[in-house]
Amino acid sequence: MARALSVTEAVSMKKETLKLTGAWADAFGEPERIGVWFIWGNSGNGKSSFVMQLCKELAKFGRVAYDSLEEGASLTMQNTLRRFNMAEVNRRFQLLDCEPMSELGERMDKHKSPDFYVIDSFQY
């Protein structure tokens, strides 16, 4: 069993963060580089558009893999990539075409795998 941390020890620990810019910094501050974010909303409320813009921001800090489980590499996805000018982050953004979770896990285990993974959308 690991030793419990004192308050002083806990608050003095250095964490790697994302220095987000503009509206992203205004909304989320400087989040820790690791973690899980859930974006929820009703169908048609702009979740995929929001997440695509988030991917573009995350690409400033590393490589992003976007697993589009609903749209894949469809015309709709092509239009979304164009609308948000994702070509600007071409070398730091990968579109995964409906990659199953088992294969995604294998991808994550590979050497030099992307730094961030986005799954759109996860059925619960």
Regions found by a protein language model. Give the residues of each.
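Structural motif
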Residues: G29, K56, D109-K110
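Conserved alpha-helical scaffold flanking the Walker A/P-loop in AAA+ ATPase domains
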Residues: M101-K112
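Conserved P-loop NTPase "ATPase switch" module shared by AAA+ and STAND
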Residues: K110-Y124
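Pre-Walker A adenine-sensing motif
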Residues: K15-P31
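Conserved P-loop
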Residues: R33-E103
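Short, basic/glycine-rich phosphate-binding loops at helix/coil junctions
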Residues: E30-W37, S113-F116
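Secondary-structure junction/capping motif
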Residues: S6, P100, S121-F122
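Charged, amphipathic alpha-helical linker segments immediately N-terminal to NTP-binding catalytic cores
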Residues: M1-K14
